[in-house]
Amino acid sequence: MALQSTLGAVWLGLLLNSLWKVAESKDQVFQPSTVASSEGAVVEIFCNHSVSNAYNFFWYLHFPGCAPRLLVKGSKPSQQGRYNMTYERFSSSLLILQVREADAAVYYCAVE
């Protein structure tokens, strides 16, 4: 059964170009602007960056009116509940397992 919202689907918004730490002005973080999913599916959100000396990825969840919440972090693949993080030198992805309507939020990555 597909989830319904005002847009007819659950949209996971992503904040673009978020950086935890910028070593130089040319360093950037890239994410897609939106990802759609259905209840029970697995959704994958990608994050690429150009920070040559980055050693940690951070994935955050943000609901309007609330402080961002750290979901998962590290310099190697890891899992925290329904959230899995993949890790490579210049990229990471966040997999959300068994997507629920309550997962509709802003997700963003940062590098350190």
Curated annotation (Swiss-Prot):
Which pairs are disulfide-linked? Answer: C47-C109
Signal peptide residues on this chain, from the entry's feature table: 1-25
Report the SUPFAM superfamilies cross-referenced here: Immunoglobulin (SSF48726)
Q: Which residues cross the membrane?
A: none
Q: What are its GO cellular component terms?
A: immunoglobulin complex; T cell receptor complex
Which species is this record about?
A: Homo sapiens (Human)
Tell me the superkingdom of the source. Answer: Eukaryota
Q: Give the protein's recorded name.
A: T cell receptor alpha variable 2
Q: Which residues form a coiled coil?
A: none
Cell membrane is among the record's keywords: yes
Glycans attached where?
N48, N84
Q: Which GO terms describe its biological process?
A: adaptive immune response; immune response
Query: Which UniProt keywords are given for this protein, alphabetically ordered?
Result: Adaptive immunity, Cell membrane, Disulfide bond, Glycoprotein, Immunity, Immunoglobulin domain, Membrane, Receptor, Signal, T cell receptor
Localization of this protein:
Cell membrane
- Ranges for domain Ig-like come to 26-112
Q: What does this protein do?
A: V region of the variable domain of T cell receptor (TR) alpha chain that participates in the antigen recognition. Alpha-beta T cell receptors are antigen specific receptors which are essential to the immune response and are present on the cell surface of T lymphocytes. Recognize peptide-major histocompatibility (MH) (pMH) complexes that are displayed by antigen presenting cells (APC), a prerequisite for efficient T cell adaptive immunity against pathogens.
Q: How does it assemble?
A: Alpha-beta TR is a heterodimer composed of an alpha and beta chain; disulfide-linked. The alpha-beta TR is associated with the transmembrane signaling CD3 coreceptor proteins to form the TR-CD3 (TcR or TCR). The assembly of alpha-beta TR heterodimers with CD3 occurs in the endoplasmic reticulum where a single alpha-beta TR heterodimer associates with one CD3D-CD3E heterodimer, one CD3G-CD3E heterodimer and one CD247 homodimer forming a stable octameric structure. CD3D-CD3E and CD3G-CD3E heterodimers preferentially associate with TR alpha and TR beta chains, respectively.
